Amino acid sequence: MSRKYFGTDGIRGRVGEYPITPDFMLKLGWAAGMAFRKQGNCRVLVGKDTRISGYMFESALEAGLSAAGADVLLLGPMPTPAIAYLTRTFHAEAGIVISASHNPHDDNGIKFFSGQGTKLPDEIELMIEELLDQPMTVVDSSKLGKVSRINDAAGRYIEFCKSSVPTSTGFEGLKLVVDCAHGATYKVAPSVFRELGAEVTVLHAQPDGLNINENCGSTHIESLQAAVLVGHADLGIAFDGDGDRVLMVDHTGAIVDGDELLFIIARDLHERGKLQGGVVGTLMSNLGLELALKDLDIPFVRAKVGDRYVMAELLERGWLVGGENSGHVVCCNHTTTGDAIIAALQVLLALRRRGETLAQARQALRKCPQVLINVRFGASKVDPLEHPAVKEASARVTEDMAGRGRVLLRKSGTEPLVRVMVEGDDENQVRTHAEALAKLVAEVCV
């Protein structure tokens, strides 16, 4: 059965445009509450990032859940992985995140966690979708859900993050710049690193509801690069708006992406005999990551793009680490979902154990030139990926690369975009092919 509302990462869109409206969120809260109550008594955690519309949608979800008889625990602004963790530790039936991740403030969305802190099973998502098409009812007033607020949520999560670092290890003498993207990590991330001994300069930690991800964070890393250089910091850490993505900047100002961070973590586990299997990347992972892991005899597999698919592959194989070049990094030895703070801590630990700088550690992975171009296709009824001209051009490029690279065309799961990616050993050739393919995709979408 195809989904009407749920995409690869929940439900997302422009605030005020269906389904990102208060009336839909009320109905969604009710439908979710009814679905979760079928599992027994129901308690649901609700958290959000810092965008202004989160208050409106929090109230709507709260009302819908209560109408279905579900008790609601409000967390306030918290990183997405914190909501997964707290859902687990409170033994709740589910957790709900109000966030549009790295998108601007005028977008918002909803995603769910199961009681185990993992993405919601497909059958529960489908049950919620079916209930959304049914008339809304209200349980007897004696069975309405109660609502309360967890006032120590941030402190609980800070202590959890710190517990991933051995008590014998600290980060004294380490000079960090941390960019919180005016998002959900603005309180907890600086506290975690400072309490572990690091000297921390904080950027973009003054959310006003409108400035989340605005020219800051992991999608706009220029100000972090400048701050690292000006402050002579050892490295910089950039989070996205909901705290599930992380990128870094070394002391020279060079960007260290998710592929490189994943390699540093995996190599550290491998050297200590704790890797447990291999590494999961995605179709977008740089070929250089695959080759660097191969040099260490570490197995590597590619999942579909999206942290839920990385997580599913890890669970199926019983492996521990995986991630995306965008900065989603999953460490199953600590978490049940991508957690930017946990991933950053594991990188810092790996550097400490080896006595390396971040700039030195990233040299072990030689990335292949890769060009990614996003093409917006709007309301076009043409499927560009199935268009004969696009298929033929893609095949020609693959043939021209002669086994020295690869081509990937795919639709974004969260935005109306086609992502055109070409990768190979010749940067000029890669860019020429990517630009030609992107131009063709744009033409057939008109």
From Swiss-Prot:
Reactions performed catalytically: alpha-D-glucosamine 1-phosphate = D-glucosamine 6-phosphate
NCBIfam families from the UniProt entry: glmM, PRK10887.1
InterPro entries (UniProt xref): A-D-PHexomutase_a/b/a-I (IPR005844), A-D-PHexomutase_a/b/a-I/II/III (IPR016055), A-D-PHexomutase_a/b/a-II (IPR005845), A-D-PHexomutase_a/b/a-III (IPR005846), A-D-PHexomutase_C (IPR005843), A-D-PHexomutase_C_sf (IPR036900), A-D-PHexomutase_CS (IPR016066), Alpha-D-phosphohexomutase_SF (IPR005841)
Gene Ontology cellular component list: cytosol
Origin species: Pseudomonas putida (strain W619)
Binding site for Mg(2+): S101, D240, D242, D244
ATP-binding among keywords: no
GO BP: carbohydrate metabolic process; peptidoglycan biosynthetic process; UDP-N-acetylglucosamine biosynthetic process
Note accompanying the cofactor annotation: Binds 1 Mg(2+) ion per subunit.
Magnesium among keywords: yes
Modified residues (Phosphoserine): S101
Annotated PANTHER family: PHOSPHOGLUCOMUTASE (ALPHA-D-GLUCOSE-1,6-BISPHOSPHATE-DEPENDENT), PHOSPHOHEXOSE MUTASE
Protein name stated in the entry: Phosphoglucosamine mutase
Record keywords, A-Z: Isomerase, Magnesium, Metal-binding, Phosphoprotein
Free-text function comment from the UniProt entry: Catalyzes the conversion of glucosamine-6-phosphate to glucosamine-1-phosphate.
Modification comment: Activated by phosphorylation.
